[in-house]
Amino acid sequence: MSGHPTVRDDPDDVMVRRAATVGHRMAMGPGEPALTEWAAAGLALPDETAMMRYRLDRIVAQMADDDLDGILLFDPMNVMYATYAPNMQVWLLHNQARYAFVGADGRLVLFDYPGCGFLSAHNPFIHEVRPATTFTYFLSGGRTDEQAGDFAAEISDLLATHGGGGRRLALDSSTTLGVTALQDTGISLVEGTRVMEEARKVKGPDEITAMRCSLEGTRVACGKMFEAMAPGMSENQVWGVLWAEMLA
């Protein structure tokens, strides 16, 4: 594995300065050595703020095409697309404890763990962060029905306020309990995975720029892996080189 120099925070970085005063940070985007490698390859950096704006606009436009009043997202990939704010992506594939609502009027509400507002503070297009109301057994125990009812009532209120006047809500995934609770409020559910796939498949200019940077990072990492390969190495050792380079 290559010995990358220690990455040092830029004291002029807005998030670094903020972290010094509020005691936490969520730094999105690349650091060294990727920045130097991309500059050497003649690659520009994406405008992340413009990318966040574009993605929200894509979701709203797709909802308009499908005559939807809102969309509720549980899939961590879709939540990330809408909010550009990650949190326990793999764990949330099993426990639906974080979700996002987008209204027909463009209102974006992220439901996150209490005290986790800093994870999305970099996104100016998230209008509100609320504590998630969880209804999976792991998190709610014997109160799953009660919690599901509270969850559905909150989403129903959002749909009434920020929808297009109807009750059509797209939903990408949920448990049977979540689906039933939403329907009990009079919401008409629509399959939401297709809606998000249609929105996400049209890439904006900054997304394409980001993809070029990502591909260059992958090319460099694979090159380091090939250089490190030697007789007698295990697959895990070779794989470790790749991941060390990808995550550096």
Question: Language-model segments: what does each one mean?
Answer:
Residues 1-220:
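A composition/biophysics-driven feature that prefers long, compositionally simple stretches
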Residues 53, 172-173, 232-244:
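An alpha-helix initiation/capping motif
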Residues 215-225, 235, 239-243:
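Active-site pocket-lining segments that scaffold enzyme catalytic pockets across diverse folds
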Residues 246-248:
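Short, intrinsically disordered, charge-balanced linker/junction segments flanking boundaries
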